[in-house]
């Protein structure tokens, strides 16, 4: 396995400017390109209070189910008042979700390890599992591929309440086991298949919910790294969050304005906000009979219109004290809750997160925080040996394949195989035959005008015969050049499937099945660097 790098620009202007080190002080509190950024952050953390003992006690209890000494050792480090954490998060996707989830976790672990050594303090990796997220349509599938087909979405055939959180949505064991079999049936059987499949099913049997299944698989993959999993949908953590819920309530109007003002600033700078903010949103969810509902503001009170529920500020404050497990964060308040709970040295962010965190600087300031340094996660493409060989054979630069795919190159190659004169001759034939046929039609209509429909049908039939000739020739070219054309398709499917980055479509199970556990052990210990270069892992 070999690690190389490429310089690939982000298509998001805001993200690229951030990566390039342009002045973004209007959007972020720390300059991640500054040499003393980590010392500054540690200094700021030293004056910020954290309920370290309570957090460690909760996490220690929650992690007992993983039976991991490394996890517990990381949790114990959090009790040290000098310790800090590198944090990142993602939804609880089936079979761990797209590859970028794995890449984000590796980013968290690598940066935590690097900073622990550089700063000589305990730095722990924490992965924030979005268990309170209720958009299950985003996590209930994986993509698979066969030799003759590109990516196919394989969705878990299970019905569920639309607004139930991932942490509380039970998996149908029978349906999920059958679905896993279908996913693995799409893989080529290898020496690793049976062991991997049985391990995945073992994790499933020990799971009740989407989040359980996700966490057990992640804990298994990163069992030696001391990765701490923080499930935002677990009722146990809500007691620790109560104080922040109440602060969000207290400053609710100002919070909505802070986000709106920051988004206006972003637009004025020529960038595009992505958070859908509304001055009537309370930026919190409320759980009622297993479903999540957005709390809104109306005429000075807090309401859930679908349920006809209303609270005054004082009533909601008391309810938060008594039933914190009923409340959860949205895209605006989740980062604030993270800052409240965890002594965060750095936040590992994907491109979309970099954009929307830039919309929250004033929200952080309002709540008395400085936004943690936001570090772009590692962008990784896995280059399999047979794909690298095909790139060389077809003389395709790897950067071209990653940035643009090979579909356009396939089309160009195919067009070049069509005889130069064939297309023009066919167009001439269609035009000339139509001209002659039109004269014949005109003469025939002089005999009987009612022949018009029949004559038009005859003209169309003749043109169809010419199209048949054209299709026959192109089909023969496809058959003749099929081997080469399939090479272009294989490269596209591997490196830029569905026209998207590899990490957004493919799942780690394909690689674990094909290359085995040693592949993953080597992969996660590669010397990745945070130089904002695209990482190429050659197998």
Curated annotation (Swiss-Prot):
Residues 455-475 form a coiled coil. Disulfide bonds: none annotated. It comes from the Bacteria. Keywords: Coiled coil, Ligase. InterPro entries: Bacillithiol_biosynth_BshC (IPR011199), CC_BshC (IPR055399), Rossmann-like_BshC (IPR055398). It is an enzyme of class 6 (ligase). Signal peptide: none annotated. GO terms for molecular function: ligase activity. Its EC number is 6.-.-.-. Involved in bacillithiol (BSH) biosynthesis. May catalyze the last step of the pathway, the addition of cysteine to glucosamine malate (GlcN-Mal) to generate BSH. Belongs to the BshC family. This is Putative cysteine ligase BshC. The lineage of its organism: Bacteria, Bacillati, Bacillota, Bacilli, Bacillales. The gene is bshC.
């Amino acid at each position: 396995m070999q690690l190389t790098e490429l310089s690939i620009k982000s298509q998001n202007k805001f993200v690229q400017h951030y990566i390039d080190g342009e002045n973004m002080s209007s959007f972020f509190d720390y300059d991640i390109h500054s040499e003393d950024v980590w010392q500054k952050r540690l200094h700021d953390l030293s004056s910020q209070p954290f309920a370290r003992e309570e957090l460690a006690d909760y996490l220690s209890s929650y992690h007992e189910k993983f039976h991991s000494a490394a996890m517990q050792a990381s949790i114990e480090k959090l009790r040290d008042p000098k310790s800090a954490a590198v944090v990142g998060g993602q939804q609880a996707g089936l079979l761990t979700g797209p590859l970028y989830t794995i890449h984000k976790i590796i980013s968290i672990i690598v940066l935590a390890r690097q900073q622990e050594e550089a700063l000589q303090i305990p730095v722990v990796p924490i992965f924030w599992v979005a268990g309170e997220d209720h958009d299950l349509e985003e996590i209930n599938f994986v993509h698979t591929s066969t030799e003759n087909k590109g990516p196919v979405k394989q969705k878990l055939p299970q019905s569920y309440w639309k607004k139930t959180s991932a942490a509380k949505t039970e998996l149908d064991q029978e349906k999920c086991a059958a679905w896993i079999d279908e996913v693995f049936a799409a893989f080529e059987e290898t020496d690793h298949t049976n062991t991997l499949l049985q391990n995945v099913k073992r994790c499933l049997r020990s799971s009740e919910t989407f989040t359980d299944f996700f966490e057990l698989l992640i804990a298994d993959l990163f069992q030696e790294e001391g990765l701490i999993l923080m499930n935002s949908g677990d009722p146990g953590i809500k007691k620790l969050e109560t104080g922040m819920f109440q602060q969000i309530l207290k400053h609710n109007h100002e919070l909505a304005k802070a986000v709106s003002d920051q988004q206006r600033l972003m637009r004025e700078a020529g960038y595009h906000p992505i958070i859908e903010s509304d001055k009537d949103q309370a930026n919190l969810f409320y759980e009622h009979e297993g479903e999540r509902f957005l709390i809104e503001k109306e005429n000075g009170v807090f309401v859930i219109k679908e349920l006809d529920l209303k609270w005054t500020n004082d009533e909601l404050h008391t309810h938060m004290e008594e039933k914190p497990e009923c409340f959860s964060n949205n895209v605006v308040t989740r980062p604030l809750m993270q800052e409240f709970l965890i002594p965060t040295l750095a936040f590992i962010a994907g491109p979309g997160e970099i954009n929307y965190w830039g919309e929250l600087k004033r929200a952080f300031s309002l709540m008395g925080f400085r936004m943690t340094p936001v570090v772009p996660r590692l962008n990784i493409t896995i280059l399999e040996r047979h794909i690298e060989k095909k790139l060389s054979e077809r003389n395709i630069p790897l950067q071209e394949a990653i940035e643009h795919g090979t579909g356009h190159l396939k089309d160009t190659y195919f067009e070049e195989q069509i005889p130069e004169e064939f297309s023009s001759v066919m167009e001439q034939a269609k035009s000339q035959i139509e001209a002659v046929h039109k004269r014949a039609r005109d003469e025939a209509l002089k005999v009987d005008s009612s022949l018009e429909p029949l004559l038009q049908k005859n003209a169309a039939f003749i043109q169809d015969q010419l199209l048949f000739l054209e299709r026959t020739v192109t089909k023969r070219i496809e058959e003749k050049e099929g081997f080469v054309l399939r090479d272009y398709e294989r490269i596209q499917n591997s490196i830029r499937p569905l026209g998207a980055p590899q990490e957004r479509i493919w799942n780690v199970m394909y690689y674990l099945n094909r290359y085995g556990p040693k592949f993953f052990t080597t992969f996660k210990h590669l010397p990745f660097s945070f130089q904002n270069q695209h990482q190429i892992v050659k197998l």
